[in-house]
């Protein structure tokens, strides 16, 4: 009697997990096929070409900053400037920026002053870039991005023609280590389902989001939402600014721009781990109960189908419902695999084979959620970009 009751509970849980993955597959397939692409609107003709200030914060980016700035200085748009801000780098980043600025009048080299304690480093650097800017439109991008020559003109054309207040592009995400390549498809399933362009672009939906690798906003509207000063303590400042835009009832458009911008998402497994922790730990401190529910949800939908499979074969094989449970488990795993492959190939534009590593990806994400839950109770430290930020309240402030 006990095994049957237990089997019934497990069966109900796994049916719910199956329903979740069915939903995810339908959602990401619909979103990928219907999401707008920059090339659809890139060639609109506009009469004016307002000046654009491209703001590039950089900290210890000697391996990527040169090719990034070269790609930005090679844009086919006429009226723009590039402002590169050194955020207290300890490598060759400052000298690379300085030497390049001497050769190209468009590039303005800025040394960020000492950062106040209640500011996150990148946010402070972006704010310094804004203060030095002279353009009507601001483009914020990262120092590890590479831009196609017509990325700026295409984005400005789209923004002006569509009478947008802000525009952000989904970049082609690049990573080099195998663990990150296996993890990214699974992680992006959740991100894509939450921050799908179809949701962000819906004015009736409150969800707003910027991709930090490329977001364009008029200086007037940037000031209206409070600049980076309003999100000075946010580790995920791009997402916070995107939310501010939607809260102010501004017209935000998120479009796929993988053919125009490439961005380095995680450089190694350590970067991947800390990138996840900077999202998860603040979540546990802001909304503890919700975070625990999310952690439990992540565990069940990612790992439970694999963990329960051998028990189904060993202990429930003689029950009629055991066969039903086995079928549900196998179908769920197949759907998980399908979602991962679809997201890898069509969503991330990387090889489909990386979607096959979904078991490793599921394990990494689940472990990070579980470990971060324990860490949030003790040493509330998040490491990001060679700095350690201590979280001493539910959300703020962060201290070096």
Residue positions per predicted region:
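Acidic donor-binding/catalytic loop of UDP-sugar-dependent glycosyltransferases
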Residues: 92, 141-158
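Catalytic donor/gating beta->alpha subdomain of glycosyltransferases that bind UDP-sugars
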Residues: 159-162, 166-193, 220-223, 228-291, ...
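Long helical/loop segments within the catalytic core of UDP-sugar-dependent glycosyltransferases
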Residues: 20-23, 28, 108-131, 158-224, ...
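N-terminal membrane-anchoring/stem segments of glycan-assembly enzymes
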Residues: 1-46, 185, 197, 365
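Short beta-strand/loop segment that forms part of the nucleotide-sugar
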Residues: 79-88, 110-112
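Membrane-embedded multi-pass helical conduit in multi-pass membrane proteins
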Residues: 293-379
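N-terminal signal-anchor transmembrane helix
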Residues: 26-80, 89-90, 94-95, 99-100, ...
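Short acidic donor-binding loop at the edge of a beta-strand
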Residues: 132-137
């Amino acid at each position: 009697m006990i095994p049957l009751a237990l089997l019934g509970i497990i069966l109900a849980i796994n049916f719910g997990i199956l329903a979740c993955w069915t939903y995810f597959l339908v959602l990401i397939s619909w979103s990928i096929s219907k999401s707008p692409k920059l090339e659809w609107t890139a060639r609109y003709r506009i009469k004016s070409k307002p000046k654009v200030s491209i703001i590039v914060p950089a900290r210890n980016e000697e391996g990527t900053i040169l090719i990034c700035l070269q790609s930005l200085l090679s844009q086919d748009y006429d009226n723009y400037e590039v402002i590169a801000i050194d955020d207290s780098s300890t490598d060759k980043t400052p000298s690379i920026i300085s030497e390049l600025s001497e050769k190209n009048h468009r590039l303005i080299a800025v040394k960020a002053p000492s950062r106040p304690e209640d500011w996150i480093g990148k946010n402070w650097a972006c704010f310094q870039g804004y203060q030095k800017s002279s353009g009507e439109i601001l483009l914020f991008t990262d120092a590890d991005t590479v831009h196609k020559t017509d990325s700026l003109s295409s984005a400005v054309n789209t923004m002006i023609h569509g009478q947008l207040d802000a525009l952000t592009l989904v970049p082609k995400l690049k990573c080099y280590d195998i663990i990150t390549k296996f993890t990214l498809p699974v992680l992006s399933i959740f991100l894509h389902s939450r921050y799908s362009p179809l949701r962000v672009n819906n004015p009736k939906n409150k969800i707003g989001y910027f991709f930090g690798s490329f977001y364009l906003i008029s200086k007037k509207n940037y000031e209206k939402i409070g600049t980076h000063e309003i999100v000075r303590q946010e580790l995920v400042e791009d997402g916070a600014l995107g939310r501010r835009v939607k809260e102010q009832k501004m017209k935000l458009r998120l479009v796929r721009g993988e053919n125009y911008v490439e961005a380095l998402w995680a450089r190694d497994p350590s970067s991947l781990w800390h990138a996840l922790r900077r999202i998860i730990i603040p979540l546990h401190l802001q909304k503890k109960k919700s975070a625990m529910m999310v952690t439990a949800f992540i565990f069940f939908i990612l790992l439970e189908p694999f963990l329960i499979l051998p028990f189904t074969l060993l202990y429930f094989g003689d029950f009629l419902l055991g066969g039903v449970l086995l079928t549900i488990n196998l179908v769920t795993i197949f759907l998980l695999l399908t979602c991962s492959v679809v997201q890898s190939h069509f969503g991330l534009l990387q090889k489909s084979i990386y979607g096959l590593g979904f078991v490793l990806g599921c394990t990494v994400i689940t472990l990070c959620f579980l470990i971060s839950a324990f860490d949030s109770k003790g040493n509330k430290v998040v490491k990001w970009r060679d700095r350690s930020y201590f979280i001493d309240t539910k959300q703020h402030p962060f201290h070096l």
